[in-house]
Amino acid sequence: MSGQQTTTHQPWPGVIAAYRDRLPVGDDWTPVTLLEGGTPLIAAPRLSEQTGCTIHLKVEGLNPTGSFKDRGMTMAVTDALARGQRAVLCASTGNTSASAAAYAARAGITCAVLIPQGKIAMGKLAQAVMHGAKIIQIDGNFDDCLELARKMAADFPMISLVNSVNPVRIEGQKTAVFEIVDALGTAPHVHALPVGNAGNITAYWKGYTEYHADGLIDRLPRMLGTQAAGAAPLVLGEPVSHPETIATAIRIGSPASWTSAVEAQQQSKGRFLAATDEEILAAYHLVARAEGVFVEPASAASIAGLLKAIDGGWVARGSTVVCTITGNGLKDPDTALKDMPSVSPVPVDAVAVVEQLGLV
C-alpha cells in the first residue's frame, strides 16, 4: 500500500554465517547450509515448579534434520568440500547418518553410512536413505563401525570422516552455547545434556569457555552429563563391551570424545550420572505431557539426570538450568507407539464425547 513502509525480517542465516568470526572457516569458503541453528530456548514452567529450579529447554530437535548434529555437519561438509574431498563417511546409530546424508546431498557429494547390527531407530535411517546415502551394515557394534570408519578415512584421503572425532564438528556444535548465552544474557548455573559419543558435552564446554575468555559471561556452568545405565562407560570409568538401552542414540560403550568429555566434567566441577531405561522413559513422558515438547528417548536422559541430581541435592533449588533436547521425538516413533491406548467408539453425540473426556 502506498504511503506505508513494510518491515523486512532477515531470516536466520545458518550457524556459519551467524558466528563466522568464531569458527575455523576460510574467507572464500561457501557454507553448505540448511539454515541450521537458531533453535528455540523454551522456558519449562511446570518442570521449574516441580523442581524449584528455573529450567529452560534448548530444543535442538528443531534443526533441519531433527537433531543437534546439523550444527556440526554444516561445518564438516563445508570443510570437506573446500578441501576437494569427494565423499563423507560416518559410523552412526541414526542421527549422524541423517544429518551427514542431508548435507552431502546439499553439497552434491557421496555419503556412506556404517551402521551396527541390532536396534536402529528406523525413522533416522529412513532419512539417510531418502537423501541417497549408501548404507552398509557391519557385523559388530557402534564402536566397531567407528574404528572401521577411522581406518577408511586414513587410508583414502578423498573420504572425510564426519563423526564427532572430526574437530570441525565440535566447532559447529559449540554454537548452541552462543545462542543460549545470547538469549539468557548469561550462562546457566547447570547445563544438563545426554552423553553418548561425548562430542556434545565437549563442544558445549568449549563454547562456554570461549565466551568466558572473551568476557561475554562472568561465570561458567557445571556440566551434568547423563548416560543410560546400560551404556555408561564414563560413569563406570571403563568401556562397556555390550552397551544396551532403549535410548539408541546414546547406546555407545566407548565414546570417541572420552578424554575431552572428562576434561569438561572436571574443569566445570560437573558430574556424570546414569539413568535407567525406566527413568529415561518417565522423563520422556513427563516432558511431552508437562511441557508439550516431544523428544527422542536419548534426549530425555538430560531430564532424567537432572531430576536425579536435584533430588540428590547436587543441583540447588533456585538454580538456572538449561537442558539440551538433542533430537526430535519423531525420530523414534516406535517408542511412542508402545503407549497407544485402546480406542473404543462412542456415539455421534456431543454429551457422550464430553463424558469420554471426563469433563462432566
Curated annotation (Swiss-Prot):
Pathway participation: Amino-acid biosynthesis; L-threonine biosynthesis; L-threonine from L-aspartate: step 5/5
Function comment: Catalyzes the gamma-elimination of phosphate from L-phosphohomoserine and the beta-addition of water to produce L-threonine.
Enzyme Commission code: 4.2.3.1
Residues bound to pyridoxal 5'-phosphate: N95, G196, N197, A198, G199, N200, T326
Modification N6-(pyridoxal phosphate)lysine occurs at: K69
Enzyme class: lyase
Names of required cofactors: pyridoxal 5'-phosphate
Quaternary assembly: Homodimer.
PROSITE patterns attached to this UniProt entry: DEHYDRATASE_SER_THR (PS00165)
CDD domains assigned: Thr-synth_1
Molecular-function GO terms, alphabetical: L-serine ammonia-lyase activity; pyridoxal phosphate binding; threonine deaminase activity; threonine synthase activity
Reactions catalysed according to its record: O-phospho-L-homoserine + H2O = L-threonine + phosphate
Family of this protein: Belongs to the threonine synthase family.
Organismal lineage: Bacteria, Bacillati, Actinomycetota, Actinomycetes, Mycobacteriales
Superkingdom of origin: Bacteria
Protein name: Threonine synthase
